[in-house]
Each structure stands twice: as structure tokens, then as C-alpha cells.
Amino acid sequence: MNVKEAIRERRSIRDFKSDKVKKEDLDLILEAARLAPSGTNLQPWRFVVVESDEMREKLRGCTLDFVGDAPVTIVCCVDYKALEEMNDRLKELQEVGALKGTALEKIDPSKYKGRKMSEEDIKRYLHLNLSIAIENMALQATELGLGSCWLMMFNEKKLSQILNLDDNLEAVALLPIGYGSDNPAPRPRLSLDRIVIDRV
């Protein structure tokens, strides 16, 4: 399956079989997240893999029931401490020549502060970066014949307590993964004419 096929075949699966996900498949899915691009190569994503029956049952108490039916759920978090490593990430990009020809090519990484952002902007920035990693995982799962469902409907405070997340971590999304009980039809999508505002 190529990327185009994975994009076309991916569906949000809400009815999972009880079959376990193979460890090697789960590792490939997590590796797809690890390889995702991010602003300044910040890589602010952190993941908690929920597989045990006990923890899956606890998940039901803070999100939709079907999440507990999935054999594995990846809790997708952002790490606000990642911002403290921005200078290190910038230096790495300089060392591999990724910033050649840009204003950041010769800047002193130790003095780089990035653009000034409000707390809301920082949150949005980290969430957007995490989103890329989540979609990578969803597409990798599809290629492996697995279903997933990216959702943000959960009680964040309760989930953080259940998982004992550090204060610097924010759970942003859940990605239950498993073998779908059925093969749902393609969902309706808007036409290109509706979504492309202009070509200038």
C-alpha cells in the first residue's frame, strides 16, 4: 500500500475486534510518530501506550466506551518542557545543514529565543506539531491493516490522574488502535471546489 492508498483507505474505526495488536506493528506505528516533522525539529510529542485490561477499563471512565474495547490506545501528549530544548534542536538542524540559505543558518543557537508567543499561541503550536505525528500513526496503522480513531472527547483531568502524568505533559488526543469489526464505506468529503478558496 502506498501513501495515496493509505490516505484513501483510512477510516475512523469505532468497533474493534478483541484481537491483540502485534508488538512489531505497534512499534512501527510509534516509529511513524517519531519520524514526523515538527517546527524547529522540536518533537514535543510524548505517548502513553495503554494495553492492559485494567487500564483500558479505566479509560472507559473518562472517554467514549468504545475506546476501552480497542486492544491498544495511544494517549497522545505534548511536553511543554520540550520548549526548553529549542536551542539544542536548532543546533542539530544547523549541524546537518537543514537550515542552509535561511536566516537561521548562522544564528547562535544559544541566543535563539524563537518568535514571541503568548501561552495560547504556544499551546496551539505544540498541538499542531503533535497532530502531524498522530496522522502519521493513523496512516501507518492503515497500511498494516489496522483501524484507528483519532478523538479528543475525554476528561483530561481524570485521564491525567489515571495515568499519573507529570505537570509538564498535556494529554491532547486518544488514538485507539485495533482490527475493525467491519469495513466502513468512505465518508463524504467536500469537493476541491469547496475547499480551495483561490489559486493566485
Report the location of each language-model feature.
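Acidic, surface-exposed loops and disordered segments
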Residues: 1-200
